[in-house]
């Protein structure tokens, strides 16, 4: 949760707690006596707060405080009312001092104590005094509190005070507890964990958390982030450039003219003419291609794709025979994925499986990646996801690519 959102909630929460203190005042009057010269201005302050005239209410509290020779109980009631009025008037320092005085008096009923401590912790957070917010939040739990809002406030205070290791540890504990209970962790919790890892330069922790966010709350911007980081991962292979583009295209993150051109060219070079044509047509349809000084170049690439498709149709039988005659299954895998992306998904699955069975593959995990995607293209999503999940080889980044396709496929229609 970013600080501005939590502050808004904290301000509202502080106001609710302050109104509780006002509502509880009549009951407190019944316990011990308050002299009229103290009680009347306090009653007036209470009435003013009910109409949101908090600064006027503070003036009445000061009037009560000016009465000489106050009893400890009268002082307690004055500070209690001052805390409520100051909270409503957004006078944080005054509210904090008053709340601390109320707690220190020892006169607050046991039933009220936790709410007062919660209000104090919240007030410290609103004042950006994060160490004090953590201190009073800890006391809240020590005295038996169990409110999730205070725990969130404490973790956010750890983050804001620069203790990113602590905010990561506590956020992760909450998230894991939610998952064990079968609940989706709150998006705010996951974002806080991600930011805690990011501040520690813990890239693996950050990526793992973004993957959780994609699982529970998929967003285009998150996909853009994780795909970008994937390419920067040490050891990530350039051979997977086309696979990265495929993820960008699927998640709505292929946007620039250069990206459309490069992806189309890579697809054509890989022998996937139909895939290249699809990319080119999408680029023309959304305005990324066909405009500007390079418009003629874009049209020539489209013509080349159409030519390659026509050639592939003529040579399909011969190419399949040649792949079947090869000593290894590499050509069958390449041809099978080309079939899968050209509207022949079922045939593509069959061809890739034949290539895997033949063996001698240069990169077996790449072959399983394309088999999983081919199954998904064929409408057998569950089978495809199962295969993608089985990819354990991370040579060059293929396992990372497979994992992202699992996340995407699980959330797509």
Predicted features along the sequence, with ranges:
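Generic helix N-cap/helix-start motif at coil->alpha-helix transitions
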Residues: 34-43, 72-79, 109-119, 144-153, ...
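Surface-exposed, polar helix/loop patches in the mature regions of secreted/periplasmic/lumenal proteins
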Residues: 89-154
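C-terminal soluble interaction/assembly domains
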Residues: 327-413
């Amino acid at each position: 949760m970013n600080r501005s959102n939590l502050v808004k909630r904290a301000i509202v929460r502080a106001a609710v707690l302050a109104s509780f203190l006002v509502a509880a005042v009549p009951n407190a009057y019944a316990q011990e006596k308050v002299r009229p010269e103290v009680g009347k201005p306090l009653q007036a302050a209470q009435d003013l707060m009910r109409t949101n005239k908090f600064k006027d209410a503070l003036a009445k509290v000061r009037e009560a405080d000016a009465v000489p020779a106050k009893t400890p109980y009268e002082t307690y009631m004055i500070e209690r009312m001052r805390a409520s009025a100051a909270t409503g008037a957004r006078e944080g320092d005054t509210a904090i001092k008053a709340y601390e005085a109320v707690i220190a008096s020892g006169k607050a009923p046991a039933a009220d104590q936790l709410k007062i401590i919660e209000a104090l912790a919240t007030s410290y957070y609103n004042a950006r005094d994060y160490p004090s917010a953590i201190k009073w939040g800890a006391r809240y739990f020590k005295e038996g509190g169990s409110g999730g809002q205070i725990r969130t406030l404490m973790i956010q205070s750890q983050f804001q005070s620069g203790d990113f290791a602590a905010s990561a540890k506590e956020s992760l504990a909450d998230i894991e507890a939610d998952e064990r209970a079968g609940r989706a962790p709150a998006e705010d919790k996951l974002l806080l964990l991600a930011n805690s890892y990011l501040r520690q330069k813990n890239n693996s922790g950050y990526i793992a958390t973004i993957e959780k966010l994609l699982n529970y709350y998929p967003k285009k911007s998150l996909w853009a982030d994780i795909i970008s980081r994937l390419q920067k991962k040490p050891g990530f292979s350039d051979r997977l450039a086309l696979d990265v583009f495929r993820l960008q295209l699927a998640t709505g993150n292929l946007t620039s003219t250069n990206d459309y051109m490069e992806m189309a060219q890579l697809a054509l070079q890989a022998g996937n003419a139909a895939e290249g044509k699809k990319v080119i047509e999408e680029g023309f349809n959304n305005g990324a291609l066909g405009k500007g000084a390079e418009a003629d170049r874009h049209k020539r690439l489209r013509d080349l794709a159409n030519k390659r498709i026509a050639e592939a149709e003529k040579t399909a039988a011969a190419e399949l025979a040649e792949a079947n005659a090869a000593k290894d299954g590499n050509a069958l895998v390449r041809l099978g994925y080309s079939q899968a992306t050209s509207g022949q998904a079922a045939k593509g699955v069959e061809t890739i499986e034949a290539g895997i069975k033949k063996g001698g593959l240069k990169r077996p995990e790449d072959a399983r990646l394309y088999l999983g995607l081919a199954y998904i293209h064929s409408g057998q999503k569950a089978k495809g996801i199962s295969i993608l999940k089985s990819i354990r080889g991370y040579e060059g980044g293929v396992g990372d690519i497979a994992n992202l396709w699992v996340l995407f496929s699980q959330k797509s229609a």
